[in-house]
């Protein structure tokens, strides 16, 4: 979800799109990473 990506962006102080590129992130990957 966008909410999860937003939390990631806040946590790492990076733009959401940059995080998605770095992680190759889809929601499941991001959620696993946050949990």
Curated annotation (Swiss-Prot):
Signal peptide extent: none
Tissue-specific expression: Antenna.
Transmembrane segments: none
Keywords from the UniProt entry: Pheromone response, Pheromone-binding, Transport
One GO MF term: pheromone binding
Gene Ontology biological process terms, A to Z: response to pheromone
Keyword Nucleus: no
Superkingdom assignment: Eukaryota
Similarity-based family: Belongs to the PBP/GOBP family.
Function: This major soluble protein in olfactory sensilla of male moths might serve to solubilize the extremely hydrophobic pheromone molecules and to transport pheromone through the aqueous lymph to receptors located on olfactory cilia.
Quaternary structure and interacting proteins, as annotated: Homodimer.
Protein's name according to its UniProt entry: Pheromone-binding protein 2
């Amino acid at each position: 979800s966008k909410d999860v990506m937003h939390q990631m962006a806040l946590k790492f102080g990076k733009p959401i799109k940059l995080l998605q590129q770095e992680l190759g992130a889809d929601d499941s990957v991001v959620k696993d990473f946050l949990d």
